[in-house]
Amino acid sequence: MPPSGLRLLPLLLPLPWLLVLTPGRPAAGLSTCKTIDMELVKRKRIEAIRGQILSKLRLASPPSQGEVPPGPLPEAVLALYNSTRDRVAGESADPEPEPEADYYAKEVTRVLMVDRNNAIYEKTKDISHSIYMFFNTSDIREAVPEPPLLSRAELRLQRLKSSVEQHVELYQKYSNNSWRYLGNRLLTPTDTPEWLSFDVTGVVRQWLNQGDGIQGFRFSAHCSCDSKDNKLHVEINGISPKRRGDLGTIHDMNRPFLLLMATPLERAQHLHSSRHRRALDTNYCFSSTEKNCCVRQLYIDFRKDLGWKWIHEPKGYHANFCLGPCPYIWSLDTQYSKVLALYNQHNPGASASPCCVPQALEPLPIVYYVGRKPKVEQLSNMIVRSCKCS
């Protein structure tokens, strides 16, 4: 028995001595990440997604299915969903980190251009070098009550098939019949109709700040000093001569429109808190014997995995998750024992070693019903595309 007041110091030495005796080797044994079997990982990911979707839609529980109309979705709603899905598919798989305001779901709205029979188009009918598209800002304001709520606005035009290559330009209508240049594009020959998309977020935000009225865009042939042919050879659905019967309906439905994504006013009041977002998105710290931190595939079927019938499109999606070890190096040049002790003191539930976490995430467009009204919304950060050690 040691005398009273004395301690056996050797008991405190093994960890530092191990670090000194094994310089340059991974300290995998020091990780506080727990080994979790794959099925448990998947179950936790599914439950996290259940909470994410309800939270992003500001729903305390899944909507009732009792009043949902039977049959397929209305054509206009399906067209809006398809437009949103196509836009997401066309974006980069490695987006910039989204600001906190992008946590909540965005309501997606389609605002059609003013009908071609409106008198505002009278002065533009005989112009061959341009086509004109006008929008009523009161329609836009219905979807976006306040300019800061607007997340993104796109002008979408359906170009009909063409055998001609042409350089085109887009302009924004200013006061006193002046036009502001926005951008250009080279259109190559195509055998099928194709959608053209232009980012006009800043323009629409400007319109919302100016008040109600009629605003518009001009889509023109590039004017070259070397060419005498300034005629626009591009046909746009909804602007070229109207078809009859069913073709006329499709023609009208596909006329140019603004695709608006905005945070609903009631959700904007909850943007001050970011803790809830982090708790849902990065609550788990994984480590296993698998090689490398990387994306693991996980498909979620809304009916089978979540027991939900209220999401009409899509039926499911590849949510994916991150898994794999993240070793780091301990050596004589990197004495982290004091820092590690301090870190553990202030973060008792956190991992002492790097963990495999999502790096790039993509949004998920959905169609669901509120009562008997179908809604199209875009849920941010729902699909894991790449992972990193952090």
Swiss-Prot record:
Disulfide pairings: C285-C294, C293-C356, C322-C387, C326-C389
Annotated stretches, region: Arm domain: 75-271
Tissues where the protein occurs: Expressed in cardiomyocytes. Weakly expressed in the mammary glands, with a slight increase of expression following onset of involution.
Description of post-translational modifications: Transforming growth factor beta-1 proprotein: The precursor proprotein is cleaved in the Golgi apparatus by FURIN to form Transforming growth factor beta-1 (TGF-beta-1) and Latency-associated peptide (LAP) chains, which remain non-covalently linked, rendering TGF-beta-1 inactive.
Region span, Straightjacket domain: 30-74
Cellular component per GO, a single term: microvillus
Matches recorded under InterPro entries: Cystine-knot_cytokine (IPR029034), TGF-b_C (IPR001839), TGF-b_propeptide (IPR001111), TGF-beta (IPR016319), TGF-beta-rel (IPR015615), TGFb1 (IPR003939), TGFb_CS (IPR017948)
Endpoints of the signal sequence: 1-29
Region annotation (Bowtie tail) ranges: 226-252
GO MF term list: cytokine activity; deubiquitinase activator activity; enzyme binding; growth factor activity; identical protein binding; protein serine/threonine kinase activator activity; protein-containing complex binding; transforming growth factor beta receptor binding
Keyword vocabulary terms for this entry: Cleavage on pair of basic residues, Disulfide bond, Extracellular matrix, Glycoprotein, Growth factor, Mitogen, Secreted, Signal
Family membership: Belongs to the TGF-beta family.
Name this protein carries in UniProt: Transforming growth factor beta-1 proprotein
